[in-house]
Amino acid sequence: MAKVKGGLGRGLDSLLANGADNSSGDRLTTVAVKDIRPGRYQARVQIDDEALQELADSIKAQGVIQPVIVREHGLSRYELIAGERRWRAAQIAGLTEIPAVIKTISDETALAMGLIENLQRENLNPIEEAQGLKRLADEFGLTHETIAQAVGKSRSAISNSLRLLSLPEPVQEMLYQRRLEMGHARALLTLPVVEQLELAQKAVKNGWSVREVERRSQAALQNKRPEPKKTAAADIGRLNDLLTEKLGVNAEVKTANHKKGRIVLYFDTPETFGHLLEQLGIDYRP
């Protein structure tokens, strides 16, 4: 899908409002389950079969409590915008119809609504969540602060989630499969890329806790630093952590004799670089 033209920096409320055809309004009705097709704009890729069956059992007992959201797609056909789990569970439960809100909205608004609806839920895996957040940032030019407000998370949580996409692909796959947790990933991000993969593989093999991976990450970093004074080295390590948290990218303070030095900031995508400039208060458009 093409990126949104001329939408950089606009608020999410404006995006959603401008994408709707308010002349027709929303319609609450029932729609044949077979007439709905999966949406193109879903953050969710992986759906747990056991959880889906539990939802289907609930629907058999109580019906579909919350309508799905769709838009018209051809004659008597609908495209799903939000509510894929409910729609799939309704099929398992044997329902032929499902309550639905029919909206008349643009592609970009359908994308935003579908992503936000899924991101507000708790059961996305960390990589699905990061990929959904990245689409909101890339395709709509939304700031981390705006995204944070939309999905009900802190700005630092958004930045930390997006940083997961800088991990090596095999490590991302471990997160996708939930063999590693978000806490493991945060600890791994402090290390060079080659060491991230090595430690991740050991963590999965040995079933290490988040605390254990944090301890080993810190030990690996300390082994690389010259320590003329232990207190000074600890201070620099703490400063690295503070800069990384504040700027949303890996940061490293390097000193010579503790009198002069340099600060190195690492980024691996244009989007990460753009966010860094934003955090530094630099308004730059290439």
From Swiss-Prot:
Keywords: Chromosome partition, DNA-binding
GO biological process, one term: chromosome segregation
SUPFAM superfamilies associated with the record: KorB DNA-binding domain-like, ParB/Sulfiredoxin
CC terms in the record's Gene Ontology section: chromosome
Coiled-coil regions, chain positions: none
InterPro entries: Chromosome_partition/occlusion, HTH_ParB/Spo0J, ParB/RepB/Spo0J, ParB/Sulfiredoxin_dom, ParB/Sulfiredoxin_sf, ParB_dimer_C
Transmembrane intervals: none
GO molecular function terms listed in the Swiss-Prot or TrEMBL record: DNA binding
SMART domains found in the cross-reference section: ParB
Keyword check for Aminoacyl-tRNA synthetase: no
Keyword 4Fe-4S recorded: no
Family: Belongs to the ParB family.
Biological function: Involved in chromosome partition. Localize to both poles of the predivisional cell following completion of DNA replication. Binds to the DNA origin of replication.
Official protein name in the record: Probable chromosome-partitioning protein ParB
Species annotation: Neisseria meningitidis serogroup B (strain ATCC BAA-335 / MC58)
UniProt lineage: Bacteria, Pseudomonadati, Pseudomonadota, Betaproteobacteria, Neisseriales
